[in-house]
């Protein structure tokens, strides 16, 4: 089988105007970026508001492993399959970050014959949205220090500046820095640090904003510091929001591309689900729903992270509700959850599969807590055996009363996911609730919201909140932010805060190390265990295998 990039490069792509025509977008509403990528004009997006919305399909997964689950691949394959069976489907994805592309994960445009293309452009600079978000965030950082330098009229306490800097790269050396060294002309030295762009509150605001006006209003609510008498300082106080909105104006228009089979795909925004809320932009999701009968979207990492935040943050803020949920699993990953090392995953092991099944079972149970119909997509690998597939399907049927469907979209494209597509249509047309069940009520205390997630979804005995975090939570409550939802930042590899504790651990304690207010986005970030908002590169980063060949073509971007 050729590599992903070889498959993508061999494809004959349709002009982006032809893709737009399929979903009723006129040429005049497109801002082309070359022949195969375009942004959709703000005015056209606004003109769609009166149109009825289609059905929303959420794709999530089991807890990820190094064996890979293929959630984006399945999202693309399902969208292609829905179009193949006569449904009008639009795929809605997040934009990849450069950090993971050059780090451990590699590209994030799907795989095999279920990809969005042009994959090199999508995985790298794309339309410059991340540059715009990084620039807007950096402008805010510069304005804060500039305000202090020129007299500090707002009385900002430089010890309590919460606004860190960002860059779209995995770079552990930037986690903690000292800035403004070199003399008085460079400002007031203080401790600072960098996060990755996808963890920026600007990214979260970008993805949750309804339109340009809402974007600017949300930017203005962002709290960046405190005064010496402990009053909040916002970006509106610093008069930063107008210039930031100008930087983000064009970026806020969703990006239209295509799959290998010519299905329309909107790729827009890209917060991680382990350190942010993990969903593509509200604007793109709503646009997909108004342009198609079905909008197929994904939420990052496992259902304990991305799906929970999709429901408790994105749906709570917007009124969206999935008509069906797909949980992606692989036999390989389940066997790894059952204790098998990666090098042995190609060998049949029914006992390990049965042991690792508990991870899938908990994710299914958690999705059902949201009150949503669910189906399991078994992303097929060539090493899977019929006995293993039969075992998993029987476990799902007998223990969970859920259908598990073998999907071969990686090798066969949309044709390999038609059975899944028909099952999704049956679930969606069966009638899902207009509002999902949220994990916690809005008026619960912030600490109780964290505890409820930990005990209900993670199987934890309790939470342990460090004193610094407890003090900040109490202050957030006092300042009127107690009704905000919480955004859990923790390892994606486990229900616990220990990435090595696989399967479905119970009775553990979730350690809350810190909390951060995201008043503009409308949630409180809860930093658990050793999770970092600036990742580092692995010992052998993917960047080492990426290069240009003699003809100037990119190689190694898998």
Swiss-Prot record:
ATP binds at residues 65-72. HAMAP family: FTHFS. It comes from the Bacteria. Keywords: ATP-binding, Ligase, Nucleotide-binding, One-carbon metabolism. It is an enzyme of class 6 (ligase). GO terms for biological process: tetrahydrofolate interconversion. The gene is fhs. InterPro entries: Formate_THF_ligase (IPR000559), Formate_THF_ligase_CS (IPR020628), P-loop_NTPase (IPR027417). Transmembrane segments: none annotated. This is Formate--tetrahydrofolate ligase. The keyword Ligase applies. Belongs to the formate--tetrahydrofolate ligase family. One of its GO terms (molecular function) is ATP binding. Pathway: One-carbon metabolism; tetrahydrofolate interconversion. SUPFAM superfamilies: P-loop containing nucleoside triphosphate hydrolases. Its EC number is 6.3.4.3.
């Amino acid at each position: 089988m050729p590599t992903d990039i070889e498959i993508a490069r061999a494809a004959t792509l349709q002009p982006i105007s032809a893709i737009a025509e399929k979903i009723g977008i006129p040429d005049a509403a497109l801002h082309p970026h070359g022949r195969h990528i375009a942004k959709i004009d703000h005015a056209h997006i606004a003109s769609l508001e009166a149109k009825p919305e289609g059905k929303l399909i959420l794709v999530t997964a089991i807890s990820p492993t190094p064996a890979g689950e293929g959630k984006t691949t399945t999202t693309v394959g399902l969208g292609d399959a829905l179009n193949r069976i006569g449904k009008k489907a639009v795929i809605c994805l997040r934009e990849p970050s450069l950090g993971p592309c050059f780090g451990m994960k590699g590209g994030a445009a799907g795989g095999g014959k279920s990809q969005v293309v042009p994959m090199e452009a999508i995985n790298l600079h794309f339309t410059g949205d991340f540059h715009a978000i990084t620039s807007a965030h950096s402008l805010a950082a510069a304005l804060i220090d500039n305000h202090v330098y020129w007299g500090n009229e707002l009385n900002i306490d430089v010890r309590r500046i919460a606004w860190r800097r960002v860059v779209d790269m995995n770079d552990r050396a930037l986690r903690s820095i000292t800035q403004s060294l070199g003399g008085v002309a460079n400002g007031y030295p203080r401790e600072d640090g960098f996060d990755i762009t996808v963890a920026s509150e600007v990214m979260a605001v970008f993805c949750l904003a309804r339109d340009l006006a809402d974007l600017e209003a949300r930017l203005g609510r962002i709290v960046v510091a405190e005064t010496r008498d402990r009053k909040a300082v916002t970006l509106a106080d610093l008069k930063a929001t107008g210039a930031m909105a100008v930087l983000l104006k064009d970026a806020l228009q969703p990006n239209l591309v295509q799959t290998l089979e010519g299905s329309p795909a909107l790729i827009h925004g890209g917060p991680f689900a382990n350190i942010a809320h993990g969903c593509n932009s509200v604007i793109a999701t709503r646009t997909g729903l108004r342009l198609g009968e079905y909008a197929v979207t994904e939420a990052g990492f496992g259902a304990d992270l991305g799906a929970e935040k999709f429901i408790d943050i994105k749906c709570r803020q917007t009124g969206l509700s999935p008509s069906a949920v797909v949980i992606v699993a692989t036999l390989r990953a389940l066997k790894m959850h059952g204790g098998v090392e990666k090098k042995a995953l190609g060998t049949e092991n029914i006992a390990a599969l049965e042991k690792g099944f508990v991870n899938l079972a908990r994710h299914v149970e958690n999705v059902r807590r949201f009150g949503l119909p669910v189906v399991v997509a078994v992303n097929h690998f060539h090493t899977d055996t019929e006995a293993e597939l039969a075992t998993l399907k029987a476990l799902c049927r007998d223990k969970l009363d859920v259908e598990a469907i073998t999907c071969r979209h990686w090798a066969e494209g949309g044709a390999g996911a038609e059975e899944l597509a028909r099952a999704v249509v049956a679930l969606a047309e069966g009638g899902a609730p207009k509002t999902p069940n949220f994990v916690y009520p809005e008026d619960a205390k912030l600490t109780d919201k964290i505890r409820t997630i930990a005990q209900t979804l993670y199987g934890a005995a309790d939470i342990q909140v460090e004193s610094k975090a407890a003090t900040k939570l109490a202050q957030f409550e006092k300042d009127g932010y107690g009704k905000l939802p919480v955004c859990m930042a923790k390892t994606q590899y486990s229900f616990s805060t220990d990435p090595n504790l696989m399967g479905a651990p119970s009775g553990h304690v979730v350690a809350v190390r810190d909390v951060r207010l995201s008043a503009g986005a409308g949630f409180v970030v809860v930093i658990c265990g050793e999770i970092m908002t600036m990742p580092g590169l692995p010992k052998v980063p993917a960047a080492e295998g990426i290069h240009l060949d003699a003809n100037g073509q990119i190689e190694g971007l898998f």
